[in-house]
Structures are given as structure tokens and as C-alpha cells.
Amino acid sequence: MRTRIKICGLTREADVDAAVEAGVDAVGFVFYAKSPRAVSVAHAAALARRLPPFVTPVGLFVNAAPHELAAACAAIPTLMLQFHGDETPAQCDAVGRPYLRAARMTPGFDLLNFAQQFSSAQALLLDAYVEGYGGGGKVFDWSLVPSGVTPPLVLSGGLSAANVTDGVLKVRPWAVDVSSGVESAKGIKDADAVRRFCEAVREADARVAASEI
């Protein structure tokens, strides 16, 4: 199985183009004002129009009001939602869009129970716990991930070309998500780093395929 790839925190046309060129499956736009990678709905919509078919735009939200979610969905008709705050299952479902739900991994966190609560999610995005909200660019202990979790898992948190191969081999996620690990500055992606990250994911997939022969 091919591991899907999402690049998050895009703010520039050139970075969207580089991600598409590298073969990513999804790109993320941050709609959280406190993030250095935050973009307006109008800017995100303009960036999303550069995406070819079968590359999914994803909007990251933290405790957003219903009207904010509705505005983003109206501006970007194909938008998938990613909830990174304290949203309840009912709040996530109420929008009526496919969504990812972030889980902040710490020792003792009951991911199986969390997965049951958010069984309607398209996937659970596993990130390291940091103070505040949003990704902190930190790697969590991958051994905390139990087997048999549904829905599918998206591995996130401090990934880069240097460690994503190992992460895919150990966790076997449906997808991986990276932001700071492919940046030259906050919100500014490095096209070469994006390319190397994607190559490292494909290297992991090749190893998995070889082991199954």
C-alpha cells in the first residue's frame, strides 16, 4: 500500500506548485490566527485553485466558530477539514464535511477510546503534545500507537526526510503529514526538502513491499 503524503502550512503559490510537482496527495491551509502559517480564506481559496484533480485541500481549524467553517467550505468547495482544538464529535459532524481529527499523543493517552468517539472521522492525525494548539514540530514516542486502531492514521509531529522512512516502517500509517520539517522559515517551504521528504516516504513503501514478497 502506498503511504499518502500531506504538506501542511502552505502560504505561497510557489510552495503549492512544488508540493504538486513532488507528488503529494493533500496540502494544508492553516485557519488559526495565532499560527505563523495562518492564511485568510480568500488567500487559501486562490492557492487551492492551483491544485490539479486528486490533490485534496485541507483546512486546519482550532475551535473555530460555525460561521468560520462555513465560510471556508463555501470558498473552497472540495475542502476537507482538520480539527486541532477541543472540538467534540458532534461539532465535527455538524459541518457535514469529511474531516481529520488530531490526537495529541502523550503517555497514557487512550487512543482506542478517542478513536471510538471520533469513529466518523476520515482519519485520526497523531501529533505530539505541546502547550497550546497546533503542531509543535516535535516527535512523539511512536511506540504509544496501539495496533488495531480505526479509522486510518495519519502520522505527524516533527517529521522530516531524516526520520519519516523510519516512522512509516514502525507505525505503518495510512498517511504522513509534515510542515516545519520541509521549511526554510515558518510558512516558507523548501522545494528540495519537500521533494526529499516524498522520496523518503516512497523509500519506506518500497521496503515494506519488498518485505512482503
UniProtKB/Swiss-Prot annotation:
Keywords: Amino-acid biosynthesis, Aromatic amino acid biosynthesis, Isomerase, Tryptophan biosynthesis. CDD domains: PRAI. Pfam families: PRAI. One of its GO terms (biological process) is L-tryptophan biosynthetic process. It catalyses: N-(5-phospho-beta-D-ribosyl)anthranilate = 1-(2-carboxyphenylamino)-1-deoxy-D-ribulose 5-phosphate. The keyword Isomerase applies. Pathway: Amino-acid biosynthesis; L-tryptophan biosynthesis; L-tryptophan from chorismate: step 3/5. GO terms for molecular function: phosphoribosylanthranilate isomerase activity. The keyword Isomerase applies. It is an enzyme of class 5 (isomerase). PANTHER family: N-(5'-PHOSPHORIBOSYL)ANTHRANILATE ISOMERASE (PTHR42894:SF1). NCBIfam families: PRK01222.1-4, PRK01222.1-6. This is N-(5'-phosphoribosyl)anthranilate isomerase. It comes from Methylibium petroleiphilum (strain ATCC BAA-1232 / LMG 22953 / PM1).
